[in-house]
Amino acid sequence: MSGTDRSQAAGAVPDSDPGLAAVSSAYQRFEPRAYLRNNYAPPRGDLSCPDGVGPWKLRCLAQTFATGEVSGRTLIDIGSGPTIYQLLSACAHFEDITMTDFLEVNRQELRLWLREEPGAFDWSVYSQHVCLIEGKGESWQEKECQLRARVKRILPIDVHRPQPLGAGGLAPLPADALVSAFCLEAVSPDLASFQRALDHITTLLRPGGHLLLIGALEESWYLAGEARLAVVPVREEEVREALVRTATRCGICARTPMPAHLQTGVDDVKGIFFTRAQKKVGV
């Protein structure tokens, strides 16, 4: 990972597709705590490093939400994995947030943090950093309290299904915005599956709503404990093309390389991308 939440939404899906079946099987060995140690503890979790991917991701999100152009009432985080950092800036702008993941072990990790239970991963360094870059005078405790209050549900998801959240109607749809960090490329065996997964999640978004994607560039594998998980390597232009095909306008696309000192042997990621896209109206 590159700070990459790829545990997120590994679908079991269609049994007739051996590639997707292999992805689902591999993710049964996913270890959330190993993943968090690899990517959110130092050195990658050292947010004081100016060229680190952690500060870059948080800055992209904070600057996007600071524009006021990405807002509404409902937001769905697609494939949350065991992480919450991707919502620290979003929670000031959306009062109803749904977190999702394919794996129960990741959903349990999220519940530990939301309930402030013993043994929960400590995200306070990330919360402090977001408060610093937002510059609103908010304490990190207030930031975390707001996020906990605004996450209304944690649901199973399978991005390889045409209805990723199923037909139960447990989340208010369509959502005003979607966030997805290090999910689609990590659970898709090839670019065609990546495109279909993007098409599927976009059905959850209202026309005119925004989709924020963070992901890994040119990565083929990463480690999460005993699990060595395959990733479909994507380039920035392929992400752009996929967004165009799924009837969204890609307004912002940025990238940053993975610094050499953060190439720690837990993946082969080359860089990180951030995109902001808007679903077209009337298509």
Curated annotation (Swiss-Prot):
GO cellular component entries: cytosol
Chain positions found as Phosphoserine: S7
Record note on modification: The N-terminus is blocked.
Protein activity control: Inhibited by p-hydroxymercuribenzoate and p-chloromercuriphenylsulfonate.
Tissue: Expressed in the adrenal medulla.
GO annotation (BP), single: epinephrine biosynthetic process
EC number: 2.1.1.28
Full protein name: Phenylethanolamine N-methyltransferase
Species this chain originates from: Bos taurus (Bovine)
